[in-house]
Every structure is written in C-alpha cells, then in structure tokens.
C-alpha cells in the first residue's frame, strides 16, 4: 500500500470562506482593498496523463500537482493511476483527500467509502471520512469515525485532535479535553502544524473558539509548555473569553502565573466601565 497523508484538525473550518452577496450600493462605500474578489473556477492547466506512464509515476505526479493546489489535474493523475491499480485503498484515500480540499464533500465521502470497502483497517480513511462528517456538522457520526480510526491506530495525534473538535462541537467539553490532552501528549505541535496534504487541524466554530483557546492554554500549562500556554491565553483574551478570570484560580496555570509575561498579558485586558 502506498503511503497515505493524513488530514489533521482546521485552524479555521474548511467552510470559512463563504462569500456573502451584498447590495451593489454597499460596494460603492468601501475601498477596493476591502472588496471580496471571487476566485476563478478551477481549471486544468497541464497535459493529461500519458497512457504509457506507470501507476507509480502517475501517483507521484499527482502528489506534486496536489501540493501546488492544481486539484483537477491531480485528480486526473490519481484516477489514471487507479485505472492501472484498481481498488487501491491508498489511491482512493488520496482521491478523497483531494476532493475534500476542493470542498466536494459528497464525492470525498464516496471515495473514502470505496477506500474502506477495499481495506476495512485503513485508519486514515476513517479519520478523513470523519472530517467530511464534521464539515457537514454531523458531529455524532464524525465522533464514531474518529474513534474507529483511533482503535486502529492510537499513535496519531491528529485523530485525537479531530475527536476533540467533534466532541467540543457537541458541547461535550470534558471528553473533548481528554482527547485534546492525549493529542498534545503525542505531539505538542498538533494544533500548530498542517498536514502534508495542506489541510489544517479542525477547530471548533467561531462561537466556541474563545473557550477552545482557553482549554488549549490550560493543557499546555499543565504539561509545562508556558510559551504555548501564554500564546493561547492571549488568543482567548483577545476573543473575549467570558470566564477568563478562572486563570487566577485554575491550578494548571500556577506556573504560568509566576511568569512575568503573564502579568504583562493580563495588563492588556480592556477595562470594562460600569453602565
């Protein structure tokens, strides 16, 4: 089986780039730099796959094309490789990842389903199908797929991170924290890095983001990563986390509170004037 990149948790949700249709009068009131420019449609820009190319060469070329976001061309090359290696779970998973990057969720799910039909123990495919469900806000089935992935591979930080995001979205905060903690134990950089495929870690919706940042700050503090804890505390503060005062009593922050940078951070809090 060919190597298979994983999809992590989304520093911003994959659906965060919706365009709003606004009255034409509005656009006359804003500068050109503030206007939203509609992206051109996806196009094929390179020659089609050569009929005599090997499956390995086609797959390697598809990887290169996907890395530079030429997704339609990448799909052509992956599918040409798949024609030479029918029912390859690795190729089906990579096709699904590419479709996921294009936000073609129905097609991506179908590809992951086919992948799992070819290989029922393909942990990455369960995780990636869970991402599709997460983006469709089907958090319950996303949780089930993430747990299936973890049952097959308990060493992947991204699986636990994705599980935490789905539980967080369901407002199941305590089990979400447990999942996030395991993710950090496996990879302290799990919330910072992007996967080899370019999809960032899934994160909760904007409405839950402040609480999420505070939760991550607490996890990093508990594990002794003061720099990262302070970074996420700053984010929670900037996003107006309503229970930020808990930082003074939560035992996990005991070490962080002794850091001079903590005092500098809380000094930046806006003063709320009484009405």
Where is each model-derived feature located?
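Alpha-helical segment of the N-proximal tetratricopeptide repeat
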Residues: 51-84, 90, 97, 101
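Structural signature of tandem alpha-helical TPR/SEL1-like repeats
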Residues: 68-80, 101-114, 136-148, 170-182, ...
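Position-specific recognition of the canonical hydrophobic site in helix A of tetratricopeptide repeat
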Residues: 66, 93, 100, 117, ...
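Helix-start (N-cap) detector for alpha-helical repeat units in TPR-like alpha-solenoids
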Residues: 55, 89-90, 123-124, 157-158, ...
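Terminal, low-structured helical/coil segments at or just beyond the last alpha-helical repeat
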Residues: 30-52, 193-196, 200-210, 242-275
């Amino acid at each position: 089986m060919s190597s298979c990149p994983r999809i992590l948790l989304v520093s911003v949700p994959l659906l965060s780039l919706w365009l709003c249709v606004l009255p034409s009068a509005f656009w006359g009131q804003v500068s050109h730099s503030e206007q939203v420019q509609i992206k051109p449609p996806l196009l094929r820009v390179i020659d089609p796959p050569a009929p005599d190319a090997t499956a390995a060469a086609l797959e390697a070329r598809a990887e290169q094309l996907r890395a530079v976001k030429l997704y339609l061309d990448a799909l052509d090359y992956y599918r040409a490789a798949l024609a030479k290696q029918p029912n390859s779970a690795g190729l089906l998973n990579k096709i699904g990842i590419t479709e996921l990057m294009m936000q073609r969720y129905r097609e991506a799910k179908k590809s992951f389903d086919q992948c799992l039909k070819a290989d029922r123990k393909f942990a990455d495919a369960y995780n990636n199908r869970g991402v599709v469900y997460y983006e469709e806000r089907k958090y319950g089935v996303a949780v089930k797929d993430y747990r299936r992935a973890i049952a097959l591979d308990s060493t992947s930080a991204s699986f636990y991170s994705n599980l935490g995001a789905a539980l967080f979205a369901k407002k199941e905060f305590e089990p979400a924290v447990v999942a996030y903690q395991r993710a950090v134990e496996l990879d302290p950089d799990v919330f910072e890095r992007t996967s080899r495929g370019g999809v960032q870690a899934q994160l909760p919706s904007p409405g839950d983001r402040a609480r999420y940042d505070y939760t991550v700050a607490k996890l990093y503090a508990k594990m002794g990563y003061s720099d990262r804890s302070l970074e996420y505390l700053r984010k929670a503060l900037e996003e107006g986390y309503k229970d930020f005062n808990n930082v003074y009593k939560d035992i996990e922050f005991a070490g962080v509170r002794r850091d001079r940078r903590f005092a500098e951070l809380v000094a930046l809090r806006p003063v709320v004037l009484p009405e």
